Amino acid sequence: MKTKGVSKVFKSGPGGSSLRPRIVEAARALFLSRGFIRVTADDIAAELGISKATLYREFTSKEEILKAVVRSLMAEIAGHVDAIIKKEDQSIVERLVALFAFLGGRLSLLGPVFLRDIQKSAPAIWREIEDFRRDKLLINFKIILAAGHKQRLFRGDIDDDLLMRMFIRLVEGFINPTEMLRSGRSPAETFESVIKVFFQGLLTDRGRQDFSSLTPALFEPRKEGAS
């Protein structure tokens, strides 16, 4: 699924109103700090100093506001990820380290409560998030694998299609609100664990050395005799 409609998130309301992007910005801050369920339309209107009637002239429901917020977040994430991946003046190691740092920080910002609320209260929007995540993973993981193999940083004895499916299953199985709330781990900790487990098995000795020079906590070179 492409991020269809994302570019239309801030389309002006009736009469070319500039209020719509302000509503999305205010709602985003409230949703991220309190979760979706605990924020009311009255809260959003009060944050902006407008009436609820004015709010509903721009959006028909709180769910429609949520959709706009989610699509703005997806567009922002997609833009950052694409920019990192396309930095051909940097090595794939440098790009991956930057990508891990960005995604870990973004997961911490979103938090499991906000994501759980979407999963429970807005399943159609949650499916859109899952489709977006899966598609971006597939597209960018192919680029990463190709570059890593070319530089002999990744092992060549494992089928790439299998690797991609394994990585997607890991992400979907552990980087989801239900699992993060159950485990008590922060989103960043969960993401770091998934990355460590997966890439430690994928990297060649050379790849592990290159990564460890930039991310020693994640990719320490194996010591002699270590299991």
Predicted segments with their positions:
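Hydrophobic alpha-helical connector segments
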Residues: 68, 82-113, 164-167
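Short secondary-structure transition hinges
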Residues: 104-143, 150-153, 158-162
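Short hydrophobic/aromatic patch on the recognition helix
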Residues: 49-59
